[in-house]
A protein has these predicted regions:
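Active-site-proximal alpha-helix that buttresses catalytic centers in soluble enzyme cores
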Residues: 1-139
């Protein structure tokens, strides 16, 4: 499952090893129930096992925040950060709040590049997977 390449071009440096200058932040809403994040942590851990530098960040309730995750990656020497929102659709959080947060990151960390992937539901492969999942659930 990947973002459409037309919107987020593949980055040959992501996962290139310890000398890579690129990292990923998986950005999710957050919840009061701590177990809520377990699937996200599993995705993060699987991506890390592939050699990517990946951090989780949350819009609210949970930590770290997007700013804290970005600050940590930049302190570790990463110059390109791709933010992958784990939201199914483009609502207020992705249309208004995330762009404002990314604008703030760009001002505070002018020497870094911040990219933003589209919502999960913008990817035809994600929609096909959801359709297949629903079909399995009703049979």
């Amino acid at each position: 499952m990947r973002a459409p390449s037309a919107q987020v071009p593949p980055d040959p440096l992501v996962g290139a090893g310890p000398m890579s200058s690129s990292a990923v932040i998986l950005f999710a809403h957050g919840a009061r129930e701590p177990d809520w994040a377990q699937p996200l942590e599993l995705v993060r851990d699987r991506l890390r096992a592939e050699g990517l530098r990946v951090e989780l960040a949350y819009l609210e309730i949970m930590a770290p925040s997007l700013e804290d995750a970005a600050r940590s990656l930049i302190a570790d020497g990463y110059k390109t950060v791709t933010i992958v929102p784990l939201f199914l659709a483009q609502g207020k959080h992705l249309k208004r709040q995330l762009p404002e947060m990314v604008a703030t990151l760009r001002k505070r960390h002018a020497d870094a590049e911040f990219r933003v992937a589209p919502a999960l539901g913008d990817d035809p492969e994600i929609l096909a997977a959801i359709t297949a999942w629903v079909n399995r659930a009703v049979r």
